[in-house]
Every structure is written in structure tokens, then in C-alpha cells.
Amino acid sequence: MAEGQIIKALSGFYYVLSEGRVFQCRGRGVFRKKKVTPLVGDRVVFQATSETEGYILEIGERQNELVRPPIANVEQAILVFSAVSPDFSAKLLDRFLVLVESKRITPIIVISKIDLLDGESKEEIARYVHDYRRIGYDVIETSAVTKGGLDELALRLRGRVSVVAGQSGVGKSSLLNALRPDLRLKTGDISTHLGRGKHTTRHVELLEVAGGLVADTPGFSALEFNQIELDELPHYFPEFRTYGEGCKFRGCLHIAEPKCAVREAVEAGEIPSYRYDHYVSFVAEMKERKPRY
């Protein structure tokens, strides 16, 4: 018996990476009886029946599980947002950050196309970078053209399972191609356009990039907050957690409650006002959704 990780699932076969070799495996019938489906990203115990084939005996406990794309044990999300073309969207980034935080996945913010910045836009992006770093997020500025920031990104990918997410046209494929030129991913191959991945129906595969595994489909192709409860939302804004302990009321939603330490921190300029505005907008969105039964 050996241990490995599923890197591809296709036509009833599971391709397991183990010590640098890939085995084409079938799942045992017991999984069907238990209604358990092995997922890409699963850590498994398998029995090799030849140099290249085998069958899966056990599926390890999952750290997390994404539905779209169907993948397990994602350790980090590379959130790619371009500095320009399309313009940087802090609100969309905050939406992704909430979703990532809710899945207990470590976010890494990558700002691409920094080579295209000029004076005023350079200052604006620098302010955003400063704000998100101050909150505690890992932010990398990159350019697929000048190769700036690529070594730093490669270091983050090493030894981890990552998904890539972000707007359409931000350069996700270009960045992965720059890290591993033989991939030859076409622009648009990894695509999330405000929630609709171009190929969410095709198989998911983990690609070996920079010593780590990266999903070749967009992470979080559904951008709604359907799986998040309203009282959980403040926890997914790390700076709110820090100040929230000073609120008068336990379970403060930081909207209209008296003596709210978070709102006081916003007024004092200690929390970026745009982050708070996005939070208020998300609260309103969640209040409007239909109840789940």
C-alpha cells in the first residue's frame, strides 16, 4: 500500500501522484455504497497493481471542499487582480477574500500587470497594497512581461495545493505560463467572469507548477454568499476581529449598534472606509436573500 494525492479525475479513473509517479486508479465499490466520491485533491491510500495502475483503498479526512470546481484540501487561493486593464476592483477582491476565509483557505493577493502603471494609478495601487498588507494579507505585485514578483509567487506555490481565482483578463494564464512555459495555457483557459467559469463542466486537474500543485480551473466560480450565515460575516474581515472585541454588545454586526468599536475604528481611519462600505453592502445582500430550508 502507498499514499498519494489525486491530481486528476476523468471517466471513472483517478490519477494519483505518489513520490513523483502517477498511477491510474479505480475507486473501490465501498465508496459507492457509502456515497463517497473521491475528489481531485484528496489524499488517499492506494494499492498499486502495476507500475502505472492501482485502486484506491481509503480517502483521508478533507481539510475543506469546494463545489465549483469540485476539489478538496485546497491550502491557498491565489487571487489575481490586475492593476489596470481591467481596473483593480477592491470590492470584488473583498468578495473573494470573504469566500476564501469562509473555507479556511489562506488567500494570497497577486496584483498583476504592474508594468502598465503610471504616476497616479501607481499611487492608488500602492495605497491598496499598503492597506491590505496592514490588515495582514500577503500581497505580491507581479508582471508576466518583466517577470517581476514571479520568484516570490513561485516560493508561495512550492509544496502547496492552490487554486487561482480573479476577474477575467487579469493575466492568470499568463502568470502560470511565465512560471511554467511548457503549459502553454491559452489566455482565457482559466477564466472566471464575475462568477461564470468558462469550463466548469470539464474535468479538474492539478498541474505541477513551481514545486506545488495548482488547479487548472478557476477557484470559486460561484461568487454568492449562500453558504455563509450573516453572523459569520464579521469574522471574515480580519481587522474587524481585532477591533470587534471592544464592541459593547456581543455579536455586534457593526451596522447600527451603539458603542461599536469597529465603526469607531473606521471613523478614526484605522480601518479603510472602502472595506467597511463593502462589508455593509455584503450585509445588505445577505439580508435580501431568500431563506434556506
Curated annotation (Swiss-Prot):
Keyword Kinase carried by entry: no
Binding site for Zn(2+): C247, C252, H254, C260
Cellular location(s): Cytoplasm
InterPro entries named among the record's database cross-references: G_CP_dom, NA-bd_OB-fold, P-loop_NTPase, Ribosome_biogen_GTPase_RsgA, RsgA_GTPase_dom, RsgA_N
Keyword Transcription regulation: no
Cellular component, GO annotation: cytoplasm
Cofactor note: Binds 1 zinc ion per subunit.
Origin: domain of life: Bacteria
Binding-site list for GTP: S112, K113, I114, D115, G166, Q167, S168, G169, V170, G171, K172, S173, S174
Group of enzyme by EC: hydrolase
Obligatory cofactor(s): Zn(2+)
Sequence similarity: Belongs to the TRAFAC class YlqF/YawG GTPase family. RsgA subfamily.
The protein's role, per its UniProt record: One of several proteins that assist in the late maturation steps of the functional core of the 30S ribosomal subunit. Helps release RbfA from mature subunits. May play a role in the assembly of ribosomal proteins into the subunit. Circularly permuted GTPase that catalyzes slow GTP hydrolysis, GTPase activity is stimulated by the 30S ribosomal subunit.
Designated name of the protein: Small ribosomal subunit biogenesis GTPase RsgA
Organism: Geobacillus kaustophilus (strain HTA426)
Lineage: Bacteria, Bacillati, Bacillota, Bacilli, Bacillales
